[in-house]
Every structure is written in C-alpha cells, then in structure tokens.
Amino acid sequence: MSQDPILTSKGSQEEEDFFGLDNFFPEPESPLPPPFSFASYDIPANIDFYVPDHRKSLILRLVGSHPLWGHHLWNTARTLSTYLLETPQITQSRHVLELGAGAGLPSIVCVLAGSSKVIVTDYSDEGLLDNLRFNVDVNLEGEEKERIAVDGHVWGQSVDPLLGHLPKGQKYDLLILSDLVFNHSQHDALIKTVEATLTSSSTQSYDPSNPSAPLTEPSILVFFTHHRPHLAHADMAFFPRLAESGNGWAYEKVVEEWAGAMFENDPGDKKVRGTVHGWRAWRVRDGEERGEKPSRISL
C-alpha cells in the first residue's frame, strides 16, 4: 500500500477543486501543505434525504497520514454505505456501533438513514477522534447530530464506555466492521468487543426452510477487500473464529462488488484487490447450526 489512491471521475478521491472545496475549506495562509486531504461520497440518485447546504455528496476530511490507515477513504466504506442506504430495514430505528471507523462514512450514513443512535469509534488517538468529530459536524446538523457520538475504543478492552451511550441494560442492534479483518493479529480482540456489545438475538425462531436470519435480527456487517491477495485466507479466518465464539455465530455473504483497486501498482491480482466483499453475521438461534449459510446474492 505504498502508492497514493487513484483519482477517478466518480469520487473515489477527487481533486479538491472538483467539489469547490477550496471555497468550502479555505487554504491556510501558511506556506506548508495542509495536514489533511478531502474525499467525497456521492449519495445514490434514488436516495432522498437532506444534507447540509443541499449538497449531493458527503464530504469527508482525512487525516494527513496515520499508521492505522485512517488517511484514506476506502472503497469498502463506499460500498458498505451504499448497502446501508439500499437496505433501510437493517439500520432504521437501530442502535449502531462502528468499530475502527476511519473517516466515519458508514456511521454518518446510518444517522441520515434513520438510526436512533450511532456511536462511531476508532483507536483512542486524539487526531483520529477529532477528525471524526469534524466529519460529523460537516455532514450532520441539528437533531441528527444529537443521534451520533464519537468515542475511542481499543478492541478487546472494556466496553463499559461504549454501552454508557445507551439506556442502562441495552446493547447495540447493529455493528459495523469496515476493512478491519486485514488486521489478523487482532481478530480475537475484535471478536471480544463484538460479543460484549451486540444485543442478544431476537425471539424469532430458526426456520430450516429459510436459513437466513431476518435483516432485523441483531447482526454485524463485515465488509472488506483483500488488499493483500496472498493473505486472503487469513482475512477469511475471522469468520470460522467468530462462529466458534460464545454460543456460536452464523454468517452469509450479502455483497460482492467490483470497486476498483485502491493502489494501481500494488502486488497481487488486481481483480482480487479491487473487489469488495460484504458479510452479515448473527448469533445462532435455537436449532440453528453455526457457520456459513447460503449467500443472498447470485455470484
């Protein structure tokens, strides 16, 4: 991942003047280059909700550089955000927690799509968290801003501060994990946080003739790209490890979409590096076997 993101005509990471950002975010008088860059997410034409200044895009500020890769708006976050907008039943009136959020695009989208409470988190680094707050302020106003909060969290550590954002005794209905499973050494810590923050499954019983859990079932969305194709198997190891945790988990594929390679000259098959995979996982219900379920999509 040594090369700058590709600039495309569809908003992957456009030149700032394309969006009029020179006027929106005035250049500092200092001769030094600004520590931030900007990217945008174009709202699908069939989705209608209000964005400040009647913009058709969400504007995301990215940290100038960071070892946790928060200085890019990943194609995975774009694809996941579109999925959330096109699958409203999974987000509306829900308590949502995003882990390792980077620029926070999916969380902002959840607020606009009607989630009742959204907590957007990243590693407890003040630069990352301040940048998340900036993106919330730029893209949300009024009552919408009251439904989102920014917090720091180290995977596997105490979740009490995260649960403290909700009414006593409640947990989250939806967890968002966008481009996190590449961090193979942290799978166990990530699963520990997932287990501790997702609410228990609903009372809906398992139907063998329809093995997929309803979209309203408490679940986690795990979207990612195999940025290092030779380690794809290690990315995928997250799912069987999740399935064996706690009382067991089931999972199904919900998205497979070509989004383009983030870094043109990186090693490995370009098609693999440019394809976003989206999975949904839930705790097994009574009588349900853990593990992979039939995909919801036609591959």
Swiss-Prot record:
Keywords: Cytoplasm, Methyltransferase, S-adenosyl-L-methionine, Transferase
Top class in the EC scheme: transferase
Any one GO molecular function term: protein-lysine N-methyltransferase activity
Family: Belongs to the class I-like SAM-binding methyltransferase superfamily. EFM7 family.
Role summary: S-adenosyl-L-methionine-dependent protein methyltransferase that trimethylates the N-terminal glycine 'Gly-2' of elongation factor 1-alpha, before also catalyzing the mono- and dimethylation of 'Lys-3'.
PANTHER family per the UniProt record, alphabetical: HEPATOCELLULAR CARCINOMA-ASSOCIATED ANTIGEN, PROTEIN N-TERMINAL AND LYSINE N-METHYLTRANSFERASE EFM7
Name of the protein in its database record: Protein N-terminal and lysine N-methyltransferase EFM7
Organism per entry: Cryptococcus neoformans var. neoformans serotype D (strain B-3501A)
Taxonomic lineage of the native organism: Eukaryota, Fungi, Dikarya, Basidiomycota, Agaricomycotina
Gene (name only): EFM7
